């Protein structure tokens, strides 16, 4: 993220807690060096969280305080901090959240899409069945949807979204939010696919998908028809055979 986004309250916490649990100690050291202070750091990430959580809980029970820091964004959103917080709550330990940057909310506000009702999906599952179920829900949902994705998998996801939601579905893709090379891309899925064609994608990606806008019509419900077509093709029918079946 951007070092200037950290609050005075967050800096005060980092200075005065017993120790700091951070996703990458090297990144947290940069923050401390920038503001001329230090503290005891331990690594806490997806690779060591199962072993670290019991030790951190024991430290908290003994009266120590700990600050949880992620590499970017809000700790506990799409990272192992969620498991630590849940375990601390189950042990009736005090949790205080210090407000800070969150890519999903930053992108949502910047998108211009309706923000009073939205769905946060984070990173989609890798298993095809679970993934398709969520994409089908996004396809028919009137609410704005928020996704995170790796730059290496973005093109695959965009093609999946086009297949299920259609190329004209409203979308905004945000790259490197709050950083020097921040980008806001697109208006439709087709536009975003064209933009990234033949490009090497780098950086952190946040995707905002506009809700489905149902047209007033007496014809067959297009969403249900498209869903049925998708399921028939998935079941093994060719696209032409499935189309004839539904005709």
Please place each PLM-identified region on the residue numbering:
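Glycine-rich, flexible N-terminal cofactor/catalytic loop recognition
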Residues: 1-46
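Short active-site oxyanion
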Residues: 14-20, 92-96, 143-145
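Conserved helicase motor
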Residues: 44-50, 124-127
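Short phosphate-binding loop-to-helix
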Residues: 46-61, 80
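Short glycine-cluster motifs
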Residues: 61-121
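A contiguous loop/helix-start segment that scaffolds small-molecule binding in enzyme catalytic cores
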Residues: 144, 151-247
């Amino acid at each position: 993220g951007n070092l200037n986004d950290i609050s005075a309250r967050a800096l005060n916490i980092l200075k005065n807690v017993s120790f700091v649990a951070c996703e990458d100690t090297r990144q947290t050291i940069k923050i401390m060096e920038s503001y001329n202070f230090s503290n005891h750091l331990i690594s806490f990430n997806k690779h060591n969280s199962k072993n670290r959580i019991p030790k951190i809980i024991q430290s908290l029970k003994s009266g120590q305080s700990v600050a949880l820091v992620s590499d970017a964004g809000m700790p506990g959103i799409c990272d192992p901090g969620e498991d630590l917080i849940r375990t601390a709550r189950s042990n009736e330990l005090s949790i205080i959240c210090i407000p800070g940057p969150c890519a999903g909310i930053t992108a949502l506000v910047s998108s211009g899409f309706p923000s009073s009702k939205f769905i946060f999906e984070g990173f989609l599952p890798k298993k095809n069945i679970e993934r398709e179920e969520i994409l089908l829900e996004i396809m028919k949902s009137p609410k704005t949807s928020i996704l995170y994705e790796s730059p290496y998998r973005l093109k695959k996801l965009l093609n999946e979204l086009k297949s299920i939601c259609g190329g004209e579905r409203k979308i905004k893709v945000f790259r490197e939010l709050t950083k020097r090379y921040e980008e806001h891309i697109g208006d439709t899925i087709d536009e975003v696919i064209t933009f990234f064609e033949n490009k090497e994608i780098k950086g952190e990606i946040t995707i905002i998908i506009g809700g489905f806008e149902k047209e007033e019509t007496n014809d067959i419900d297009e969403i249900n028809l498209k869903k049925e077509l998708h399921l028939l093709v998935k079941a093994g029918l060719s696209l032409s055979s499935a189309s004839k079946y539904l005709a």
